[in-house]
Structure formats: C-alpha cells, structure tokens
Amino acid sequence: MTDQENNNNISSNPFAALFGSLADAKQFAAIQKEQLKQQSDELPASPDDSDNSVSESLDEFDYSVAEISRSFRSQQEICEQLNINHMIQRIFLITLDNSDPSLKSGNGIPSRCVYLEEMAVDLEDQDWLDMNNVEQAVFTRLLLQDPGNHLINMTSSTTLNLSADRDAGEKHIFCYLYSCFQRAKEEITKVPENLLPFAVQCRNLTVSNTRTVLLTPEIYVDQNIHEQLVDLMVEAILGGHFESVAEFLDEVIEALILDEEVRTFPEVMIPVFDILSSRIKDLELCQILLYAYLDILLYFTKQKDMAKVFVDYIQPKDPSNGQMYQKTLLGVILNISCLLKTPGVIENHGYFLNPSRSSPQEIKVQEANIHQFMARYHEKIYQMLKNLLQLSPETKHCILSWLGNCLHANAGRTKIWANQMPEIFFQMYASDAFFLNLGAALLKLCQPFCKPRSSRLLTFNPTYCALKELNDEERKIKNVHMRGLDKETCLIPAVQEPKFPQNYNLVTENLVLTEYTLYLGFHRLHDQMVKINQNLHRLQVAWRDAQQSSSPAADNLREQFERLMTVYLSTKTAMTEPQMLQNCLNLQVSMAVLLVQLAIGNEGSQLMELTFPLPDGYSSLAYVPEFFADNLGDFLIFLRRFADDILETSADSLEHVLHFITIFTGSIERMKNPHLRAKLAEVLEAVMPHMDQTPNPLVSSVFHRKRVFCNFPYASHLAEALIKVFVDIEFTGDPHQFEQKFNYRRPMYPILKYMWGTDTYRESIKDLADYASKNLEAMNPPLFLRFLNLLMNDAIFLLDEAIQYLSKIKIQQIEKDRGEWDNLTPEARREKEAGLQMFGQLARFHNIMSNETIGTLAFLTSEIKSLFVHPFLAERIISMLNYFLQHLVGPKMGALKVKDFSEFDFKPQQLVSDICTIYLNLGDEENFCATVPKDGRSYSPTLFAQTVRVLKKINKPGNMIVAFSNLAERIKSLADLQQQEEETYADACDEFLDPIMSTLMSDPVVLPSSRVTVDRSTIARHLLSDQTDPFNRSPLTMDQIRPNTELKEKIQRWLAERKQQQKEQLE
C-alpha cells in the first residue's frame, strides 16, 4: 500500500477526527504498532488471531475502519499520550520527531525545536516524548554545546521566526531552564485536569535540573553557570519581571538546601557573590546597572539561607584592619559615591569637572540629579540592612557584629594624625564614602523612634557604652556589638559602677551604631569641607593677586582652584542629599530630647517636663560618650554653613535643641568639657535667625526660627547659660586656652547682639546686671561682673593686637611699593610675601573680634550703666576707650592706613562711632565723667577735639556730634578741677598710695594672708580675673578682705588738711 493510500485510509477513519491532524493519527498508529509488537514478542502466537492481529495489519499499513476501531480501545489514553508529547515539546522546545513538517498540524506544537538526534536513534522507532524519557531528554539537551545547530521546523510555516529560533536554541542553560520553568507554569494554567500532574512534573524537572547544574557546573562545557544566573537576574530586574525569576530561584534554593551531598549551599552560592563584588566595584553612583545589582542583593537578603551565606561571605580577612571591611562585598557597595575615589585625583572623576565653565544653574541641576540617585541608593542599602536585622536572630547577630567590629577597627579615623598623614590613613581605614553611606542607611533604621515624643526613644540605655569586653556569646545574648566604647570620654566622670541589664534593645544598639558612624564619617567630612572652603578662599585671593601683577603663576593657581572646586562641589553634594539631612536632623533633635531627659534624671518611659531650677539625678550622663553631643552640635553647624534652608523648614523642632543648649551650656555638672560647652554656643549661633544673611534677606527665610527663638519659654536661662560659658572658657586648663577662647567667643557676640534686640532676652541680661550691682563684694564675684571684666580684657587685647599687626602691614606694604623686595632672592621674597600674608590673616582675625567686642560694649552700655561707672570697672573702660581713640583719631592713626581696609576687616569709622556711643551712654553719670581725666596715659582735651573732627568727617548725625562735644567740654572742666587737686595731693606719702596702681587710696583694705593694704577698687578688679592674693598667690575672695579703717581715717584727715591749706593759700 502506498503512502497516499495509507493517508487516505486513515483520513477516512471516523476515529481520525479525534486527532489534531493526520500526522497525529499516523503517529498514534506507529505507537500502537510498537506496543503490539512488544506484546507479540512476549506472548506465544495464537493461531486464532494471528491472521487478524493489529500488529500484522499495521505492518501491512492496512488501516481499515474495523482494524483501527479495534486498536483504539482506550481513546482517552491515546489522546493523553499525544498531548503529553506536545506539552513536553512546548515546555522544553525539544523533539524526537523529525518527520515532514507538512504532515504536522502545527496546532499545539512549537514552531521550532531542538531535535535530539542521538536519543532518537537510541530509542529506534519511538519519535515521541513521554514522562518516562523526558528527564533523559532534558539532560541531553543541556549537554548540547550548540543547540542552535540542532534546530528543526515543527510546522510547515516558512515565515522567519527569530524569537522561536532564539528560544529553542538558547545556549545559556540557566536561562534555558528558567524559560522552561516559565513555559511549564503557563502549561499548568492551560492544560486539562488529566494533564496537570504531568505539567507540574515538568515544572519540577526544570528546578531539579537547575539544582544539578549549580551543584555540578563542571560537566557542562563552556557554560559559566553563575555568570548566567547573575545575568538572568539583572535582565529580569531591568525588564521589570523579576518576580517570576524570584519564584523560580526560590524553588531552586529550596532544592539546593535539601541536597548538599556534592556541594554545600554556601559553596554553590559564593561564586555568585564573587561575581557581584567584581562587577559592582567598577560601577558609578549614577549608573542604572548598579541598582539592578543592589536589587539582586536585596532579594538574597530576604532569603534566610542566602542571607546567612551573605553575612558569612562579607566577613573581612583581618577583622582588626578597618580598610579590609571596604574590600568586602558590603564594603564595595558602601564605597560608591560622588566623592573622589582617590583624594586629590580628579582624573577619571565623573562629576563637576571644569566647574568654572558651568553656570550655577547647571551645577545645581547636576547636584539635584546626583541627589536623586543617592536617595535611591541609600534606600537600597537601608532595605538590605533591615532585611538582615529582621530575617532571623542569626543574621541579625552577624550583621550587627560586622557593623560593631567595623566601627571599632576604624576608630582611628578620628585621631588628629589621621588627617595629617593621608597616605597612611587610606591604607588603614575605610573611606569617607563608606561611612557617609553607612551613616545614611543607619539613619533610616533609626527613623521609627526619631520623633521628639517617641516613647521608644526613652528606652535607650546609656550603660551600653560602659560595658567592658565581652565574648561573642555574651554579645549575642546581651545584644551588644559595639566595642571599645568604655574607653570613650563621657559627658561627666562616673562616680560608681552602673547597673547593667540582662540585655539591650535594638533602639539602644541602633542609636549607638548610628551616632558612632556619623562621628567617624560625617563629622570628619565636615572638617574637610571647612578646610576646603578656606583653601578655596586662599587660592582665590592668590589667583586674583597673580592676575593683577601679571604673574606667570596665575594659570597654575587657576588650575589649582578649578581642581579644588571640583573636590568641594563633589563633597558638598555627597553631604547634602535632602532626605539624609532630614533624617539626620530628626535623629539629632531626638538626641537633644533624650539628653535633656537624662540630664533631669528621667529614667522612665514617659517624657518629663523641663523645670528650673533643674532637679538632681543626672548620673546616667556619666555613661553617655561626648561624641553624642559633639555630633549634634557638628551637624547643626554644618546645616547653618551649607544647608540653611533645612533649619528653617524644621524650625518647630529647634525648640528641643534650645532646651539642650540651655541645660548643658551653663552646667559644668552635666557637661564637664568646657570646649564642648563652648561649641554649643556656636550651635546656638547656627540655629538662631540671621537677619543679615543676604544683602536683601527675605523675611520668610528666618521667620519660623525667629518665632521659636523669641517665644522660647526659658529665655532668661538661655541668656545666663551663654554668659556663663563665656566666662568659663577663660580657664579651661588647656595650654592653648588663651588662643582658643577668642575662637570660642566669636559666635557668642552675634548671639548677644540678637538677644539684646529681643525684649525677653534683654530683660534677663539686665536682671543679671542688676544682681551683679547689688552683690559686687560677694564672696564669689557675680557672673555678669566677671563677664564684663573679661569682655573688656578681650577688647583691650584684640584691638591692641590688631593695631600692632596693621602697623607692621603698613611698613611692609611701603617697602614692597618702593621696590625694596625686588632685589631679594626668590626665597627671601617668598618669605616676605608669606610674612605679609600671615600678618594680614592675624590682623583680619583680631579686627573682626575687636569690632565685635567694642560693638557689644556699645549696646550693653545703652541700658546697663551702674556697673560700668562703678570704680571697679570705670577706670579700666575709660583707659581702654581713650587708648583706642588715640590710635584711631590722633596723630598715630597714620600708622594704620593700610592699602585696603576691607581686606583686613579694619573698620575704623565703626570703631570710632562705637567708642563715642559708649561715652555718650555713660556720660550722664557724674562719677564716670570725673574718672575720664584720671587716665593719665591717653586722655587729653585735644584727643576729644580730634574725635569730634573725625565724627564730622565720617558724617555722623549732628545730634551725636553735638552731644559728644558737650561731653568733651564737661570732661575738660572736671579735668581742670582734678589737676588742681592732684597738685594739692602730689606729695602724699607712700603709705597712702595703692601699691599696685600708685594712686591715692580712697577705701584701703587689708588682704588677709599677705597683710598688704590696697585700694578696694584695685583688689576687686584683680579678683574678677584671678581669685588669689596678688602678693603671695594665696586663694582670696572679696568677703575675706577687711577695711583698714585706721588708714582710711588718716587719709581723710590728710585730705581735709590739704584742702584747708589750699583754701587758706587762695585767700
């Protein structure tokens, strides 16, 4: 029988309608033939049916209706078998059937499949796939080195189908198995119920084969299995279908964990982490691919078993070497930022190159773009850490141990030498980027309890920081993973051992880890920013000077400036991502609340209201490291300098900061370190409104801060705290205290000025002055009296130093202009230039500070008079004012006429105006005017006449000039009268003269230890600065001195006698 006849017979068979195509029916017939043949081989031939056997009829291709009807005893089984074959072909895109595509219907079979030729030969006449041979078929398919060479058409369609070719001929076996998994999933949703178990079995087969591939990758030639896994995940993430891949991998991971005979699960997965580490380290912050890799790690850190492998994998080879943490996979991730990878090297740096060629708007756009990526990046790292903390106690312990050990190994970042030796620094410690990013992620972890009224916040236990060394098991039980905090200096010294709880909560650990990370990272970067700022200013000045003098160094200076500007913009951008700043502000405000609660002895879970006087019970501050308060101050100062808008938009929370400053600035009992308390004054300057921040400030830019500052309920205590720390930093015990105190006091002057302009603060300052006036001779000099004494000391020293430096600058400028430097050797000229620059910096600093001190005295004397005109202070302030006028308006003023006053912040007009204002404020007091002529060193009627001339020249208001002229006349009259009296008393004996001032004593007192007699006003002034006997250095207070009544009476009798004699002479 011919093929045509055979086909006709089958097509006319009514059962053929059960098949999808004529080819399917023919295939069924072949199956039956095979089965019957096997049966005939096993059973003896029967003479009754041998002539009519189906086998025989099939051999002869005699497909009559009767014969096929007898063969198809189980129609359902036959259809099922064919459908299983088609399903396997659709899932795995493989086949054993290479018959003519035109004989196949194309209905339910894929257009292209890989023909498994060797397997087809082995199975001889079986050209279909079933559940018995599918596992072998898939394994055979996986071993093909180039499956694309084995593709065949399954349908008669001649249309080019590249996607079908690509899918069936997929060379990467991991991707192939995932695709099979997806196709099996689809089959499960479509096949009839009777085929569902087989579809599920095929799906499981993809998982089991993937497990085998990962366990024994070496048997698959030219297949980098782990690379394929990573690529598959990346492609799925970028393509937006990662959930499907995750479902597949979940099952593969589960299968791997159940089968660790060949390889353990970590051994299988570590190569994946190796690949991720090598790829991530070369990526930049703004590359989309980076975020795909981070999403892969996010998936892994959600998987309990993968997360365990991850936390083991990131352990550094040497846990004591801080830099080694940066080389781990987590460290590689944390090291990515817009900061320079190698400090000072801008080559290959992708951000802010040639900034001078970019407009401010372009720089702003680039900054905003980087911030968008940073926010996304920090979120990924945060989610990763959060996953590890929440997944299991084991991963939580491991990641916290990693963080604690890392911070301990990098503790040296804060050492002074670390900034001075960068080449050693970067070999020993992890990078700035590492800690900035880690800090940003940890800040996010703290946000749930970073609310000022959070009850969770008060569960923080500071004794955590006092724990000594623990072993690993103890750390796990107690939840303590930071090391070495017991060696940190705390806010106050501990007087007793703390009571340690059984364990600590995550709030405590998170706060400590975050604060220490900020201390190692943000704090150090802020210092660098300030130095970069200073260097930029210096370069700008040098560049401008070089341009003006047509120096060949100009181009080099410009290049240096350009490079440093790139560093500055990159660093500023890295530190000012808005969400990170807001999170940090939330933390620091919460820390202010927490420290205030500890300072008032609150050990409960509910907030206590702040009341004055402060209650006792603040011993827990002895376990709070200073860096908690240092971070708070440092961050707020940073915001003031580089992100002031954050302060304004968060003004409502600043009241908590004011509480903190009020309590700690003035309380040595709660914060022993005077340097840290002085820093809080700078913090106060940072958070208070600055009306002069721009030439035309918008009221709204400080409106909210002004409201908070002016309505602060503890204004009087804040003003007192500020004045107290002003006084305290005079005696810090530091060998550099003299130089330091001026820097510490710099921010205090604008604060005092702002306070004086606000009613509540001004009244509280006046109350302090009134109290001082009434207690001038108290055992301990009143606070405000000591403050005024130090203020005048500063004014005298600073302006005198400024005058000296300006005189030197004047001389050097003249020498330079005359050409005297032209003949010097290059080295000598450089020394001269450096000297001039140094004098300029010193003059500028002293001028700024003297302007502030004199200005402060000017507004204070407007309403506080009694203290200034008291003999304790009057002579000192008068001699100071006259001395300065002598240099500013007298014949000596020519020595101060440097080229450019503004370059050195020299403001002689303002100084003259302020000095005259002080005179006019106090001039109504008769004893003050009477004291002016007693200044024999500087006062003269001519000096005041010269002052009037200068006031006219600088266009001061007419009423001021008239008032000062009248005052000058009054003082001149008193001077004439005093001169006559002095002539009368010129021959006073030494017993009547003050041994220190050599002036006639008016109120002699005896010092208890040295038994020396001095004038009361003289010793009172001395004790304001030094509470010792000036003659033997014994401790001395005003309440210990005794009046020398006998000597006082002798002096008064002698004065009366002299006056009487003078009167008689005149008559």
UniProtKB/Swiss-Prot annotation:
Pathway: Protein modification; protein ubiquitination. InterPro entries: Ub_conjug_fac_E4_core (IPR019474), UBE4 (IPR045132), Ubox_domain (IPR003613), Znf_RING/FYVE/PHD (IPR013083). SMART domains: Ubox. PROSITE patterns: U_BOX. Its EC number is 2.3.2.27. GO terms for cellular component: cytoplasm; nucleus; ubiquitin ligase complex. It is found in: Cytoplasm. Residues 987-1061 form the U-box domain. The keyword Transport does not apply. Keywords: Acetylation, Cytoplasm, Transferase, Ubl conjugation pathway. One of its GO terms (biological process) is ERAD pathway. GO terms for molecular function: ubiquitin-ubiquitin ligase activity. Pfam families: U-box, Ufd2P_core. The keyword Acetylation applies. The modification N6-acetyllysine is found at K386. The U-box domain is required for the ubiquitin protein ligase activity. Ubiquitin-protein ligase that probably functions as an E3 ligase in conjunction with specific E1 and E2 ligases. May also function as an E4 ligase mediating the assembly of polyubiquitin chains on substrates ubiquitinated by another E3 ubiquitin ligase. Mediates 'Lys-48'-linked polyubiquitination of substrates. This is Ubiquitin conjugation factor E4 A. The lineage of its organism: Eukaryota, Metazoa, Chordata, Craniata, Vertebrata. The gene is UBE4A.
